[in-house]
Amino acid sequence: MSQPAKVLLLYAHPESQDSVANWVLLKPATQLSNVTVHDLYAHYPDFFIDIPREQALLREHEVIVFQHPLYTYSCPALLKEWLDRVLSRGFASGPGGNQLAGKYWRSVITTGEPESAYRYDALNRYPMSDVLRPFELAAGMCRMHWLSPIIIYWARRQSAQELASHARAYGDWLANPLSPGGC
């Protein structure tokens, strides 16, 4: 029996203590031996990112998960800084930048609005697939495989049972992320 893929879960939430949904989602990940949970705001409250350390973490894992709330149609500021600095030319892209080629990228997003708000004719004017396009493009730039995102809409309004169900499904996927049908 083969070992499950090593997963690096990059968690980015500037107000993590107030996010019930994200804590519930993280709990199963913390109990899995193949998952490294890396809380960016806990490690870099001053935004001074240790780029060589982060790049080493990326090299050591096959699946990279970006878990964060949707902030202004993007990600929290520290994760944006992390993406710009760590996924540098020569490491992740451009000449010689093949360190992440063949790895897997999955975004796990919580939102403050219902799924119905993400349509061309709705409040946000665009579907979530369009909103997340920059992340998909970044994965492509790094020659990574883009896995369909996991999105928890209206996270604050999810019942405890709904959040527990999402967390179980997420934990099951994290335990064996590259199994047939698991992507």
Curated annotation (Swiss-Prot):
Family statement drawn from the similarity comment of this UniProt entry: Belongs to the NAD(P)H dehydrogenase (quinone) family. KefG subfamily.
SUPFAM superfamilies: Flavoproteins (SSF52218)
Example of a GO MF term: NADPH dehydrogenase (quinone) activity
Swiss-Prot/TrEMBL GO biological process terms: positive regulation of potassium ion transmembrane transport; potassium ion transport
Lineage: Bacteria, Pseudomonadati, Pseudomonadota, Gammaproteobacteria, Enterobacterales
Annotated protein name in UniProt: Glutathione-regulated potassium-efflux system ancillary protein KefG
Function recorded in the entry: Regulatory subunit of a potassium efflux system that confers protection against electrophiles. Required for full activity of KefB.
One Pfam family it belongs to: Flavodoxin_2
Gene (UniProt): kefG
Species annotation: Escherichia coli O6:K15:H31 (strain 536 / UPEC)
Listed GO CC annotations: plasma membrane
